[in-house]
A protein has these predicted regions:
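Short, flexible, mixed-charge acidic loops at enzyme active sites
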Residues: 20-27
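Conserved donor NDP-sugar-binding/catalytic core segment of glycosyltransferases
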Residues: 1-20
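Low-complexity, flexible helical/coil segments
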Residues: 13-17, 40-47, 83-84, 117-129
Length: 142
């Protein structure tokens, strides 16, 4: 399949850019796989590059999707291949103001967010299928 996204590793550092002796891939056990990434997300936006043709299908992100990077990564997987580059190419600074938290909310909150993610992904993939069928019918007409 065609590569739709690339994800690279990053060295985790503190506020003073001192290494915390861990990379984002180690922290998140990063790799491709829909269910793996529903359980523990590998996709961090600053470490991702996404093919423009994929973004045309992935965007817009639904309002009820809280983790935008995960949405993009999971849908890129649905469209084709996601390649993971093991080399840390940037520093990923951890500090009190990070949007990505090291801890999760309640188990109920996590389940609800994942449920909404799965439902929205299913809806989007069905939209793609319908759109592709309509385009195919248009092409087949004499």
């Amino acid at each position: 399949p065609k590569v739709m996204a690339v994800v690279h590793d990053a060295q985790i550092v503190d506020e003073k850019l001192s290494s915390l002796n861990e990379t984002t891939f180690e922290w998140r056990d990063s790799k491709a796989g829909f269910w793996k990434n529903m359980k523990k997300n590998s996709y961090i936006g600053c470490c991702m590059a996404v093919r423009r043709s994929a973004l045309k299908r992935i965007l817009p992100i639904p309002d009820n999707i809280w983790i935008h990077d995960q949405w993009i990564g999971l849908l890129a997987e649905q469209l084709g291949k996601v390649v993971f580059i093991e080399e840390p190419l940037i520093y990923y600074r951890r500090h009190g103001g990070n949007v990505t938290e090291l801890t999760h909310g309640s188990i109920t909150s996590m389940i609800k967010k994942r449920y909404h993610m799965i439902m929205e992904i299913n809806r989007r993939v069905k939209e793609w299928s319908e759109h592709d069928k309509q385009n195919q019918r248009h092409i087949e007409k004499p």
